[in-house]
Amino acid sequence: MARIRVLDADTVSRIAAGEVVERPAAVVKELVENALDAGARVVHIDIAAGGLERITVTDDGCGMEPGDAELALQRHATSKITAAEDLEAVRTLGFRGEALPSIAAVSRLTLRTRPAASSAGTVLETEGGLVLSAGVSGGPPGTVVTVRDLFFNTPARKKFVRSAAHEGAMISEMVGRLALSRPEVAFRLTVNGRQVLATSGSGDLLDAIGAVFGAAVAREMVPVRFEERGLGVSGYVGRPGVSRSSRRHQVFFVNGRYIRSAYLGAAAEESLHGAMPAGRHAVLVLHLSVEPGMVDVNVHPAKHEVRFSQPRDVYVVVHRAVREALHREIQIPVEECGHLESACFPGAGTGFRIPVQVTFQGGEPELREESTGYQGFPQLQPLGFLPPAYILAGGADGLYILDQHAAHERVLFEQYLRTLEQSAGKQLLVPVMVEIRGREAQTLEDYGPFLRQAGFEVDPFGEGAYLIRTVPSFLRPGAEAVLLTDVLDRLAGERPVDADAFRRVVAAVLACHRAVRGGDKPAGPEAAALLTDLGRCAEPYLCPHGRPTLIRIGFPELARRFQRE
């Protein structure tokens, strides 16, 4: 009996949908890119229940004739290419003819469309990829696609979708990136009936950055414009004062297409070495223009990644573009942090300094002698410092090498965690205003109860603006906005499930801000104190992010290496 069979069309469609439609944000991306390819100048995205219940994308693009509308729901039907040679120079966002039929295969989809030259439009209703009805429809020129009950017929896929709040935040982030790709298009995103993002469509990228990341960030952006080797780089890079704790605010486009690129990110990060505070990452929005034949956009099912024919040239051009732009505007800061109590983050050129020291009411919380420590931690004696970041220590069983930043992070993390568990927040005499938009705004809404338990009270104050009224009792004045935005940035990636996990995120962010940095040489007493405090920690061998704080080279291993056995 034959074991190999040709799959039926329904199964093939669901497999294809699994590659293209990973989550609701992928649906939004594909539908919006179709709208942009259709020449839309206004795009409205409206979602309910994180996109699982409903996604509606409305555009004022060219619309489709009845025959084209029906073909658009068939696999591999596209207006973007006509032959294999066209793949060598793709100039549109979509080109495979997979998105719409893949979405239809795992949802209940309604397509309404009308070309401007036609007095009537077309409406198609589908379920699980099957066309249920086709008819005539009115409405303005353009296209409206409504997707309901996403993954209703693929329960295995639905199990891996996160909460509605999380999926909504992912959509908000994706729409923000799409808006940054086309500042000449007016975008509007509505989530559960509430507008969370709107861009003007003025064509000014800085306006779009202000709408997506906030006006405070836009004011601190430096223009980037550079051409070399047939490549062009344009966009903006943020000054150190608006740096972030993660790379999530670094956005790259190639010929107008949003991509994920560790390669471009590495080029930009390397160019900023010495300009950004240690452990911080610049806000970046960069558009790279290349000849279509120099980039392959057909290497990823969701087109998130591309391949360059001359990757080294791309790296060099991005590196130079960012470095020259920032160096024209600011002077590279020199850190002069001499000991554990002075870890600093200079905010050069902005009049803004990230406040990393924390003042506690009633004094700094200490790891007291009676606190529960790790019972097996060895007694260590500091021997010296190995640049850039390592303390050498001797123990009864060998040589220990301590990563001073990771160790200091662990000590501070446990201090802050106990304080968060034991103390309430303190009310600020003057509330601090902070701009929070997009995914971070959704995260703020989702974690409101946990924030209050950790000592934060944050209230809305107009579109994209919030007032911080209460903060953890130990926080130094001036650090409120930076801490909150970094906490929200971390939460967007980690999504803690309870108040304890939330407090750990807050404590980890604080510890990372405060901990001594590489290159800071500790004095002898400071090194000894750090070793003692680390030994009193409940988990001394790992920093809050899971990296080792120290390693041991035993005496037998040393003897073997020196051939003394």
Swiss-Prot record:
Could you tell me which InterPro entries the record lists for this protein? DNA_mismatch_repair_CS, DNA_mismatch_repair_MutL, DNA_mismatch_S5_2-like, HATPase_C_sf, MutL/Mlh/PMS, MutL/Mlh/Pms-like, MutL_C, MutL_C_dimsub
- Keyword RNA-binding found: no
Q: Name one GO molecular function term.
A: mismatched DNA binding
Sorted UniProt keywords:
DNA damage, DNA repair
**GO biological process per UniProt:** mismatch repair
Does the record bear DNA damage in its keywords? yes
**What CDD domains does the record tag this protein with?**
HATPase_MutL-MLH-PMS-like, MutL_Trans
Which GO cellular component does the record give, naming just one? mismatch repair complex
**What's its job?**
This protein is involved in the repair of mismatches in DNA. It is required for dam-dependent methyl-directed DNA mismatch repair. May act as a 'molecular matchmaker', a protein that promotes the formation of a stable complex between two or more DNA-binding proteins in an ATP-dependent manner without itself being part of a final effector complex.
- Family the entry assigns: Belongs to the DNA mismatch repair MutL/HexB family.
- What protein name does the entry list? DNA mismatch repair protein MutL
Q: Which organism is it from?
A: Desulforudis audaxviator (strain MP104C)
This protein's gene is called mutL
